[in-house]
């Protein structure tokens, strides 16, 4: 101990990671980090034989003599299904009938022959996921067909060598010419807030409360006519506030640029409050109707652990969304630049669980929990943000089967496109806790396809140095990362876990935030 009293009063600087993990390859697989990030071409259509159109309800081939006699009115193509027959020979360990594009992806995926033979169905699932372009988002996402007579996932694979049908749906979309989504080794972490603007449509309640009717109600929802641009603008005018945001807010300073718009900080003239304002050019939004859903959802989500929606304005074709501003930046800055202790990790987990308990109680699944989407105040406050992927669930649709979110944080039931519920957020929270320990999520340095395969088949990921963690922390992680969804803890249950009782005051995060900002400044 020093004899200098002044030095004793000054706390030691928080530990800093020797190098940022954001752009590192981790040394695990240097080749995997160099995989191509170019948009993938569409699945090539086979010339022989011609692709068959499968009847949505009966599953039978169209074009029979009966159809020729009936001569029904021909309407424009809708919900087109390109059926691909893929088989797997368990003896040779080879797939048969696989599209050339899928075969090329598999060849460069680093999924070994042994892994392919061990679980060929998982291989097909991740190939279909990776190559799908049915939903255009900043990060890879997928909506599987949910038609009567079809399972929600890829059809079961016959491992004896006979063919199976992998249904690839080509939806009638507004942005059908857009390039397929791409998975990056890790997306550039959020410098500030709000990099996406669209969410999945909120399921409308249906009359039949029987859960078994979910497929039919989902089918009805998909048949709902799309809103025209004029209808969307009219609806927005009924939601937003009247006025010019450039008169109500001053000192605009650009802090970020996302695919959906530009983000500024500004000051409320009347209150003197600093806010974040996202300016969105609606003409550049392919799915404008989803913005309405996002605003309506955000208006309802008022909670101390959620970055709160404040106001919105419409000026011409420009939509201004005003949100609470947190100057501490994202948790990603802290986990990649500093080392957190267990008590600090417990504090962050507690705050996030409080937000999730609130969301889940209101039938909302966030679906994209990760450090990028956790924002920090300079005083240490912790808040969830970015509801670009959130979804509301109703008693009639208590499970969802869309594949949405950022792959490395996805729960296995999402990757394999099984029906899922709010506990997908708990799995992602567990992965985020590993981020706080190791600086990155598991499999980040793997080829994306292999990462998806490992998530689908490996179950709970292994820690790099589990012996360094306390038994109580390991138990908390196990409760979050339980493969059996029924055994996985809920937000309400985990808030009672003994690990959270170790949490330090939120003010203990401030030195980490400052250290991260300093480290990032030095790295520039």
Curated annotation (Swiss-Prot):
The lineage of its organism: Eukaryota, Metazoa, Chordata, Craniata, Vertebrata. This is Serine/threonine-protein kinase PAK 2. Residues 67-81 have a biased composition (Basic and acidic residues). The modification N-acetylserine is found at residue 2. The modification Phosphotyrosine is found at residue 139. Residues 69-112 are annotated as: GTPase-binding. Residues 69-137 are annotated as: Autoregulatory region. Residues 155-167 have a biased composition (Polar residues). Residues 1-81, 142-188, 204-228 are annotated as: Disordered. Its EC number is 2.7.11.1. Residues 169-178 have a biased composition (Acidic residues). A motif (Nuclear localization signal) lies at residues 245-251. InterPro entries: CRIB_dom, CRIB_dom_sf, Kinase-like_dom_sf, PAK3-like, PAK_BD, Prot_kinase_dom, Protein_kinase_ATP_BS, Ser/Thr_kinase_AS.
